[in-house]
A protein has these predicted regions:
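Conserved ABC ATPase signature
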Residues: 56-61, 254-305, 313, 319-323
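Pre-Walker A-like glycine/lysine-rich segment at the N-terminus of P-loop NTPase domains
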Residues: 2-76, 421
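Short alpha-helix of the ABC ATPase nucleotide-binding domain corresponding to the H-loop/switch region
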Residues: 324-329
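Conserved Walker B
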Residues: 17, 318-323, 350
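Conserved P-loop NTP-binding catalytic core
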Residues: 43-58, 62-64, 71-122, 128-129
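C-terminal lobe/lid and adjacent interdomain/linker elements of RecA-like ASCE P-loop ATPase modules
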Residues: 2-8, 330-422
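Electropositive, glycine-dotted interaction segments
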Residues: 122-248
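P-loop NTPase motor core
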Residues: 101-156, 161, 366, 379-388, ...
Length: 422
C-alpha cells in the first residue's frame, strides 16, 4: 500500500441484534481531550483530514453483558456484505433480534463510517431475518457528501456519479441480497472498492493454523514473534514449518449425484514445530504440545503484524484469553507503535483500564440494563473523571456500573453446596 493512503474505521452503529436493543455507537474519532496525559499518549491516535483517529478501542464489562454479541453482530453484518450476493430466496439470515418488548418484530440496522484509500464512506442497511428493507452508500469525494445509491424496499435512487449502469444491478438484486454485494461481483468500481475494504482491510478475526497464508505471514514476521515469546518468558528458541504428504477421505458420488463412499486422496499437511532451549534438537508439535497462551499469541501476532504494517483494522473478541497481562500490553503497544492500524477488542482484564496506556475515549464499558439489553458507553462520557484518578480501581468498585454484581457470601455458598438454599 502507498505510504500516503489511509484506511480507517471511524464509527459503527448497531441496533436490534441479539442482546443489543437500542442503538449503540462505537466511535474511533478521538474526543476533544487536551490534557497533559493525552499529549503523552500521542501514539494512540493518528491524523486524517484534520481529525484525530483512535488506533485502539477496548470493550470492558462483565460476562453476559453483550461484549461478544457486539463483535458477533459486526461479524455478521460484514459477512452480509461479503456473502449475500450468493443468497437464494427463502434464506433466513443468521442473527436474532432482541427478543423482549416486541423488538423481535422490529427491523435491525447496521451503520459503518470508514475511510478507504483517503475517501470517507458511510454505508448502512436495515433488515429483518428474511429480507433487506433499506440500504445506502454515500461518500465524500471532495469532502462533500454525495449519494452513490439508496434503496428502500425494491425502489432505488442513484447519485449522478458512482456505479456504472446501476439499474442493471438493481434488477439482479433480490430481497435477500445486499445491492453492494451484488454490484461488487459485477465489477462495478466503487462497489468493488468498498467490498475489498471489508474483505482485505477490516479483518474480523484470527488466522487459522491451516490457512494457506499462515506460512508466508510467519516467515515475514518470525523475528518479532520470537521477541513476543521472550516477553512472556517462554523458553521456545525456534519455530519451524514442516510439510508432509498425507491422505484425506474425499466423498465419491455416483452417477446420479448421490454420495456412495469415500476415496483417499493425497494432500499436503503443514505443521508447525517448536524447539526449546533445554533440548533444542527435540521438536514439539505446536498444536498439540504447546500451551493455549503460546498458541493464542502466535495466531494474534500472525494477523496483527499484517494489520500493523499495512494500515488495516482488526477486531478480536476476548483477545487476552490465556495470555499473560504483559503480553496483552505488548500486543496493544504494537498497534500504538504502528502508523495508522486499528484494533477493536474485548477484555475482562481490569488491569488494562490504565490511564498511563489509554485515553479516556479508548475505553468503552459494556453493561446489561434492567431489561436485559446491552448498553455501551465510553469513559469519556464521565466528565467528572480525571486521568489522574485510578480507573482500574474505579471500575472494580462499580463506579462505571459495568462489573458483575455478586452478592453471595462464603456462608451463603456453603449453604448452597449443602443444598440448604431453596
Amino acid at each position: 500500500m502507498e505510504k500516503n493512503l489511509i484506511n480507517a474505521l471511524l464509527a459503527i452503529e448497531l441496533e436490534n441484534f441479539f442482546s443489543i436493543k437500542n442503538k449503540i455507537r462505537l466511535d474511533f474519532r478521538a474526543g476533544n481531550i487536551h490534557t497533559a496525559s493525552a499529549k503523552m499518549l500521542s501514539d494512540n491516535v493518528f491524523e486524517w483530514n484534520g481529525q484525530k483517529i483512535l488506533k485502539t478501542v477496548g470493550l470492558f464489562g462483565p460476562n453476559a453483558a453483550g461484549k461478544s454479541n457486539i463483535m458477533k453482530t459486526i461479524n455478521f453484518c460484514c459477512r452480509m456484505v461479503l456473502d449475500s450476493h450468493a443468497h437464494n430466496q427463502g434464506i433466513v439470515f443468521n442473527f436474532k433480534p432482541f427478543k423482549f418488548d416486541g423488538w423481535d418484530q422490529k427491523p435491525s440496522s447496521f451503520y459503518i463510517d470508514f475511510v478507504c484509500e483517503n475517501i470517507e464512506y458511510e454505508y448502512s442497511f436495515k433488515l429483518t431475518t428474511t429480507e433487506i428493507l433499506e440500504e445506502s452508500l454515500y461518500y465524500y469525494p471532495n469532502n462533500r457528501k454525495a449519494k452513490i445509491f439508496e434503496r428502500k424496499g425494491s425502489k432505488y435512487t442513484f447519485g449522478t456519479k458512482g456505479i456504472n449502469r446501476p439499474a442493471e444491478v438493481a434488477n439482479d438484486t433480490s430481497s435477500t441480497q445486499l445491492y453492494l454485494s451484488v454490484a461488487s461481483q459485477k465489477g462495478r468500481n466503487i462497489a468493488k472498492t468498498v467490498y475489498l475494504y471489508f474483505l482485505q482491510t477490516f479483518l474480523l478475526g484470527l488466522v487459522q493454523m491451516q490457512d494457506a497464508s499462515i506460512e508466508n505471514l510467519f516467515k515475514q514476521e518470525k523475528k518479532i514473534i520470537m521477541k513476543a515469546l521472550e516477553v512472556c518468558d517462554s523458553d521456545i528458541c525456534d519455530i519451524a514449518v514442516e510439510h508432509k504428504k498425507g491422505f484425506a477421505p474425499v466423498p465419491t458420488p455416483s452417477l446420479d449425484g448421490q454420495q456412495i463412499g469415500f476415496q483417499m486422496q493425497p494432500i499436503d499437511i503443514m505443521r508447525f514445530h517448536t524447539y526449546h532451549r533445554n533440548n533444542p534438537n527435540i521438536p514439539f508439535d505446536f498444536e498439540t504440545e504447546e500451551s493455549n497462551g503460546t498458541k493464542r499469541i502466535f495466531t494474534i501476532l500472525i494477523r496483527l503484524l499484517d494489520v500493523a504494517r499495512n494500515k488495516k483494522s482488526m477486531m478480536i473478541d476476548e483477545f487476552d484469553t490465556s495470555m499473560h497481562p504483559h503480553l496483552a500490553q505488548f500486543v496493544i503497544d504494537l498497534v500504538h507503535a504502528s502508523e495508522s492500524s486499528q484494533l477493536l477488542f474485548t477484555s475482562h482484564n481490569a488491569a488494562l483500564i490504565d490511564m498511563d496506556r489509554f485515553r479516556k475515549d479508548q475505553i468503552y464499558f459494556i453493561n446489561k440494563k434492567v431489561d436485559g439489553s446491552t448498553d455501551a458507553y465510553s469513559l469519556y462520557d464521565f466528565k467528572d473523571f480525571r486521568e489522574t484518578m485510578d480507573a482500574t480501581k474505579g471500575y472494580l468498585q462499580g463506579r462505571f456500573d459495568a462489573v458483575p454484581i455478586i452478592t453471595s457470601s462464603v456462608a451463603t455458598l456453603k449453604q448452597l453446596l449443602k443444598g440448604g438454599i431453596k
